[in-house]
Regions:
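N-terminal Sec-pathway targeting helices
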Residues: 2-22
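Transmembrane signal-anchor/signal-peptide helices with a preference for the extracytoplasmic
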Residues: 22-44
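Generic hydrophobic, helix-prone segments enriched in Leu/Val/Ile
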Residues: 24-31, 101, 119-127
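Alpha-helical segments in soluble extracytoplasmic regions
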Residues: 42-45, 49-105, 124-127, 139-140
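C-terminal amphipathic alpha-helix
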Residues: 110-149
Length: 149
């Protein structure tokens, strides 16, 4: 019995920290993988929202169907939401430019519709890469163009 107690007193302080370190490493790896998977899912959602918005706006451009325009605006808003989740920076200038454009889409739809080809050009860049700087520059230029009208 004394021998077992001696073993417990000498080996247990070494074994417990090793087990805790292994458990902590497993938890950290699991959390890292979950974050990576979640980020990949958000990127897919972001890209699919931009592609859907672009498709709706192209359909609106070709047939003038108001439902296509409204669907494009909704998909653009979905893109903005996923973009914000990916960047975690609500004060990001790119997000602000998108937010201004979204405001124009809802409050001044006729001005946006008159410049729908410029909007589609911007979305083509964002369809390639959800944070492509040229896409945001074209969105900013479109905002300035609409503001000047």
């Amino acid at each position: 019995m004394k021998r077992n107690m001696k073993w417990i007193r000498t080996k247990l302080p070494i074994i417990i920290p090793i087990i805790l370190v292994i458990a902590l490493a497993v938890v950290c790896v699991n959390l890292w993988q979950h974050k990576t998977i979640e980020e990949n899912d958000l990127m897919v959602m972001c890209k699919s929202s931009v592609n859907a918005a672009m498709e709706h706006f192209e359909n609106y451009q070709s047939n003038g169907n108001e439902v296509e325009y409204i669907s494009g605006v909704a998909e653009f808003r979905a893109y903005m939401t996923t973009y914000l989740c990916l960047t975690d920076e609500p004060s990001d200038a790119d997000y602000t430019w998108c937010n201004i454009l979204y405001g124009y889409m809802t409050m001044k739809p006729e001005e946006v519709k008159a410049n729908i080809s410029d909007l589609i050009d911007a979305l083509e860049y964002l369809a390639e890469d959800y944070d492509h700087p040229n896409g945001f520059n074209l969105i900013n230029a479109l905002n300035n163009k609409i503001a000047a009208e």
